[in-house]
Regions:
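Intrinsically disordered, low-complexity segments enriched in polar/charged residues with Gly/Pro
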Residues: 20-22, 29-30, 108, 124-125
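Helix-to-beta-strand junctions that scaffold the AdoMet/dcAdoMet cofactor pocket
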Residues: 37
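C-terminal substrate-binding subdomain of Rossmann-fold SDR/epimerase-dehydratase oxidoreductases
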Residues: 40, 45-193
């Protein structure tokens, strides 16, 4: 199977956002857009200062395309690489404000009494910029928000209880476990249909 051109590329993606056939609303930007559409409000559970790197699903696909065609002289036989863009490192409050810009009238509420969020992180994507200059993220934040708004409106989304729906990964996993289709180790017990 392997020859001198065989390479392994581990793509460490920033947090995904955007519409997809398997939409997830437990991702920060997707959650904010869904909340704004259903309630006119975004509740930030932290003080809004934690950092999150994001990448749109279309840009993730572009990175996969790059990884499939990557040559060994571009990073070696085995490469682990952060995939995203340095300009897509945002504070949570900035993400909520972007949604409110696209959906005027959206109220943004932060929790000033929240303890510091230990999940705050900024990521360097310099290596990806160097190794994949023709596959850099193209979708901007406002376009990502608009894409989500349009997609959710097209599917007539309006479930105010979406956080307990199958569009949340943990809910979907618990449902599959409850039906006996997944083990506690998240392995299939039978082949899914």
């Amino acid at each position: 199977m392997a020859d001198e051109r065989f390479v392994v590329t581990n793509l460490r993606f920033a947090t995904a956002c955007g519409m997809s056939d398997r939409l997830r609303l437990d991702l920060v930007l997707n959650d904010f857009v869904a909340g704004a559409l259903t309630s006119g409000k975004i509740d930030i559970l932290s003080d809004g200062t934690p950092w999150r790197p994001l990448i749109h699903v279309r840009d993730m696909a572009r990175a996969i395309d790059w990884a499939i065609d990557r040559e060994p002289d571009n990073g070696g036989d085995a490469l682990s690489i952060n995939v995203g863009s340095d300009v897509w490192n945002y504070q949570v409050r900035e993400l909520a404000d972007a949604v409110a810009r696209i959906l005027p009238g959206t109220e943004v509420a932060v929790n000033p009494d929240a303890p510091p969020d230990k999940r705050s992180y900024r990521v360097s994507f310099a290596q990806f910029a160097e190794r994949a200059p023709n596959h850099q993220p193209l979708v901007g934040l406002d376009d990502a928000v608009s894409d989500l708004v349009d997609g959710l409106q097209r599917m007539a989304f309006g479930d105010p209880d979406f956080r307990s729906s199958q569009l949340m990964r943990l809910v979907a996993l618990e449902t599959l476990r409850g039906k006996g289709l997944l083990t506690d180790r998240l392995e299939w017990t039978t082949k899914p249909k």
